[in-house]
């Protein structure tokens, strides 16, 4: 199992705030197509872009709701208004994963309509929820969603293939803008390949605008992650060749970050550490690097000796 380094929320809030001015403004409620209504979660911010996208899917009176936002009071007001003005109901509530900005609206939703308490679905369900299995199908008039287990951003992460539109609800694996945070890089890369193999042109992300060319966006994501893996491996190879560090020429995570980015603040380093830690664990799982025992801060990583042919 990969060691998890705590995520530095404060730094990312500062780091990502610069891109807030570059992302498009999205209306609170948008009829994206005749089958998809997007309702923003009311939780806009540098980590969540324009806020969490929640989607009402279908064409009849009964709809599927994908995600529930963070639990902001504005979201339940907005979603209730849409339901009441259009005389529609929710048959299934599908949660892409456990993170609070996707599940936080569940209590308000149940308070609004207690009947929904038996209609909440999530992989690895919490108490009172129902499980989502890989390949499970949810149907309402005008919409057929098939669950696709795609761990990496989170272990329980689910995407949903929308058959009628040849589209994919991508959750947090692929965003409308920028890159997502990864919990397990090895699983994430496998999931990205799995998603790419679906060959779906359109993506409905959990954050950001609709993705009009999903295959191109996923190629960009995969290329970015692979570049970081190659970059870290090259640094460790250079360390061994130069005889830096000790023993096998290994480097600590701090030394790897220093080699990649130069002198940076502690906050920047804390923010970079989780993803780069995942890169190292992926390389270890691929048996390309090893590590010496020790605490996370003192652990030294090194290139494994290649066996002769």
Swiss-Prot record:
Enzyme Commission numbers on file: 3.1.-.-
Gene (name only): aptB
Cofactor mode of binding and number, as noted: Binds 2 Zn(2+) ions per subunit.
Phylogenetic lineage: Eukaryota, Fungi, Dikarya, Ascomycota, Pezizomycotina
Needed co-factor(s): Zn(2+)
PANTHER family, sorted: ENDORIBONUCLEASE LACTB2, LACTAMASE-LIKE PROTEIN APTB-RELATED
GO biological process: asperthecin biosynthetic process; secondary metabolite biosynthetic process
Recorded metabolic or biological pathway in which this protein acts: Secondary metabolite biosynthesis
Protein name: Lactamase-like protein aptB
GO MF annotation: an example: metal ion binding
């Amino acid at each position: 199992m990969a060691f998890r380094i705590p995520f530095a929320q404060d730094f990312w809030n500062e780091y990502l705030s610069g891109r807030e001015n570059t992302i498009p403004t999205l209306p609170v409620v948008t009829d994206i197509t005749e089958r998809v209504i997007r309702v923003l979660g009311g939780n806009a911010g540098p980590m969540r872009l324009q806020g969490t996208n929640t989607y009402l899917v279908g064409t009849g009176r009964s709809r599927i709701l994908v995600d529930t936002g963070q639990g902001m009071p504005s979201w339940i007001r907005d979603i209730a208004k849409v339901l009441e003005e259009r005389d529609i109901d929710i048959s299934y509530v599908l949660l892409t994963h456990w993170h609070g900005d996707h599940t936080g609206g569940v209590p308000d939703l149940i308070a609004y309509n207690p009947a929904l308490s038996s209609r909440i679905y999530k992989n690895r369900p919490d108490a009172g929820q129902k499980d989502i299995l890989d390949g499970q199908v949810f149907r309402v008039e005008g919409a057929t969603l098939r669950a696709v287990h795609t761990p990496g951003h989170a272990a329980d992460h689910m995407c949903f293939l929308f058959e009628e539109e040849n589209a994919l609800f991508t959750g947090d694996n692929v965003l409308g803008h920028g890159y997502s945070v990864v919990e397990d890089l090895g699983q994430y890369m496998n999931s990205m390949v799995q998603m790419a193999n679906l060959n779906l042109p359109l993506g409905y992300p959990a954050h950001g605008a609709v993705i009009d060319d999903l295959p191109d966006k996923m190629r960009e994501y995969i290329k970015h992650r692979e570049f970081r893996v190659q970059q870290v491996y090259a640094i460790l190879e250079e360390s061994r060749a130069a005889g830096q560090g000790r023993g096998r020429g290994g480097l600590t995570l701090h030394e790897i970050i220093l080699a990649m980015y130069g002198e940076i603040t502690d906050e920047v380093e804390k923010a970079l550490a989780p993803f780069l830690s995942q890169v190292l664990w992926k390389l270890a799982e691929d048996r390309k690097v090893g590590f010496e025992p020790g605490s996370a801060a003192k652990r030294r990583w090194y290139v494994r000796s290649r066996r002769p042919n």
